[in-house]
Amino acid sequence: MKFEWDRKKENINIKKHGVSFEQASYVFADPFALNSYDEAHSDTEERWVLLGKSLGKTILLVVHTFRDYDGKEFVRIISARTATKKEEKVYKERCPK
């Protein structure tokens, strides 16, 4: 899977949420991650919200879209933050005990 993101946007995200987009990219490897279509924020492009584990035990919420360049698909990360307690609960309910 290939990723892309805006470096300026990533720096803003790090200052605001303490999460780099590189760290967020690891959530896509989580087999228990939950990916949901974000209809409310998909006016100009389809946006998706991925809830899953990054490196270690950190559960993140990653907003992203998919881009296609000459038949090559990329995941464009838009924002990422630590999951709320409620989001963590949703994630943990999906995982095997």
Describe each PLM feature range:
Residues 1-97:
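Ribonuclease/tRNase effector modules and their secretory precursors
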